[in-house]
Amino acid sequence: MGIQGLLQFLKEASEPVHVKKYKGKTVAVDTYCWLHKGAFACAEKLAKGEPTDQYVQFCMKLVHMLLSFGVKPILVFDGCTLPSKKDVEKARREKRQTNLQKGKQLLREGKLAEARECFSRSVNITSSMAHEVIKAARSEGVDYIVAPYEADSQLAYLNKNDFAEAIITEDSDLLAFGCKKVLLKMDKFGNGLEIDQARFGMCRSLGDVFTEEKFRYMCILSGCDYLPSIHGIGLAKACKLLKVANNPDITKVIQKIGQYLKTNITVPEGYIEGFLRANNTFLYQLVFDPVERKLIPLNPYGNDVNPEELNYAGPNMGDSVALQIALGNMDINTRKQIDDYNPDIPQLSHHRSQSWDNKQLNRKTAHTDSIWYTKSEPCKTTKIEEIHSPRGLILPSKKHTVKRSYEDGVSDTDLISQYSFSKNKKARPDGDDPMQQVPASTMILQPLDDCANTKPKKPIHQPKTRNAFATFLQRQKQDCSSVSATGTRSRFFYKPADEKPHCTEKEQIVCNGSALDIAKETHELTEESSIKTEKEDSLSTISEVCKPNNQRISPLQNQRSCFTWSGSLDSESSPTPKQSPMLLSLQKFHRTTPYMQNEAENKPSWQSSCIKSDTVSQIDSNEKLLKKQDIEDTDSDEHASTPESPCQFTMKASPAHQSFFPEPKGSAPKSKVPGLLKSQSVVSGLRTKVKPRAPAKVSGLTNRSNTKATRNNENVPGLQATIGDLWKNFSYKK
């Protein structure tokens, strides 16, 4: 069936597509191809004569698939046998009868597999089987038409006259009839191979010189249902012949076919007449116009064509008979009345429900947009989705369709309100400080207005922010924006006027590598006004707060600090602010160390704390080393302190490692602060001995101590090497 090798020959013009490409449009279907596929599943029952409707279910399943994608199908069935195909139909009938007899014989012998194969080849689609599919399509409001003769010519007419956008078939003869778009090899999912006539120029074998007429000649020469081919002539040689021959008369080209192809090919007698009959059959085969409801040729007759001589293309049976055949009311073989369907009478169709929102659409009558309706337009390719809406397709209509609401679901209004800003939201005043909204528990160090004033302010209850820690870091970044990113600053060019009183706040500490922010409330303690009064106090405070006008705290000091003060040593100090419940729950994990005092030397001993520690022995060894270094640094810093600045201490090391502040040498023994251990990362970084800082230089660098007494000094002549000494050291002995 069809033209052998044509699909492979037009491979470059084909394109794999899905049927949803034609959503909202109308397609015509060669239903006999579907009937043959559906009959294969029940071939054994059909051969035995058992009743079955599997082929009907198969065809309607494909119809429902097209409707689900918004495609309106028109089912086209074959009619009477065409006189031009009597020989072909006779040969096919004999072949089917032979396979049927062979299958019955194999079934008697018990060879079931071979018998089924023979039965599948012997399937004959009868008019009664087609009528069962017609009744099923009619009940669901699907358009159909029975061709007066062949379905191929009727499909081509529907496509050329814009009744259908494309043709769904398995027969390649549709291309020879001049169809614009043909969808071949479509499966049950809607995938197929589309061949568009507009893409024929992409085929290298055809070239740009081929026209629709030459393409039809090529198909006839290569062999079709109306005329067998000449021995040795296929699509390739037929295409080559039409490219080489310049004579417009095709009969003369066929006579000289051997000269054009340079082969010894003889044209059989009667071949030219058969060629002309086949060409006229492709052009003037009778079809039925559903709008005018009469028989017409596929293409208008030419001036040199006599319709009475074209009986081989289908004799004129009359418009009334053709109408009854087209409606499926008359048997095509016996011409007996088998049904009384009238498309002009509105009938209630039982559509298959595709979704929840198209039940009302299914109640529409079938004749409203049918091709049989006399007031309908020929083109039915627009707005077809209003009749058969696919699953989930939102159709434009005045009525608002309401979907089923899910239980415990969020409505669309609530969902939109979650992603939109409220219009009644009050704007924050310009004077509001984002730091005021940060709870007191997030403040590591609280700034003090005066060193002597140690009374903490009452925490102000502020509404909880979305991310207080992010606000805190943003405020700290703005306050410390003038500080160098590396934390280094020349002490020579330093001016007290550049100091800002803030930047004393620290970030929260994340210990043990977790995301838990442990915020501990601390007190800023100050020292007494002079060194003499400090010696008389029984307790002194440990602070890292200095006067803002005299000394600037390095930003690296705030960033590298891994501990905070957790209590007060002064009995006269104000009470500790109320801790948060989170801190109270974590207080049981607070680690404390025994007091360490050195009464013999009355020197302060320092003790650090860290929540994350590997071993206790490593921390104790580092504490002893730091204790010894701090005592030595205290002795060197005692001479540098003056009565004018009693609270100011000289920084012992670089700002990156500054975490301890010494007290004057003559101070009374201090009580130890429990639970203050330095983190291991900081302690491990101070393994080398911290040297006391020398007086400030212009370059801002510390002066290294002169370890060698014999070092050359250019300012002292006695220590310089003279030329005579050099000659003595490097002279050779005689």
From Swiss-Prot:
Signal peptide annotation: none
CDD domains found in the cross-reference section: H3TH_EXO1 (cd09908), PIN_EXO1 (cd09857)
Residues that hold Mg(2+) 2 according to the record: 171, 173, 225
Residue spans of biased composition, Polar residues class: 604-620, 700-715
Alphabetized InterPro entries for the sequence: 5-3_exonuclease_C_sf, EXO1_H3TH, HhH2, PIN-like_dom_sf, PIN-like_EXO1, XPG-I_dom, XPG/Rad2, XPG_CS
UniProt GO molecular function: 5'-3' DNA exonuclease activity; 5'-flap endonuclease activity; DNA binding; flap endonuclease activity; metal ion binding; single-stranded DNA 5'-3' DNA exonuclease activity
Biased composition (Basic and acidic residues): 621-641
Keyword Phosphoprotein recorded: no
Binding site for Mg(2+) 1: 30, 78, 150, 152
Cofactor binding notes: Binds 2 magnesium ions per subunit. They probably participate in the reaction catalyzed by the enzyme. May bind an additional third magnesium ion after substrate binding.
A GO cellular-component term linked to this record: nucleus
Region (I-domain): 138-229
Cofactor(s) needed: Mg(2+)
Any Pfam family: XPG_N
Subcellular location: Nucleus
Main location: nucleus
Annotated stretches, region: Disordered: 599-650, 656-675, 685-716
Residue ranges of the region described as N-domain: 1-99
GO process annotations (BP): DNA recombination; mismatch repair
Keywords assigned by UniProt, alphabetized: DNA damage, DNA excision, DNA repair, DNA-binding, Endonuclease, Excision nuclease, Exonuclease, Hydrolase, Magnesium, Metal-binding, Nuclease, Nucleus
E.C. designation(s): 3.1.-.-
Coiled coil region boundaries: none
General function of this protein: 5'->3' double-stranded DNA exonuclease which may also contain a cryptic 3'->5' double-stranded DNA exonuclease activity. Also exhibits endonuclease activity against 5'-overhanging flap structures similar to those generated by displacement synthesis when DNA polymerase encounters the 5'-end of a downstream Okazaki fragment. Required for DNA mismatch repair (MMR).
PANTHER family: EXONUCLEASE 1, FLAP ENDONUCLEASE FAMILY MEMBER
Annotated family: Belongs to the XPG/RAD2 endonuclease family. EXO1 subfamily.
Protein name: Exonuclease 1
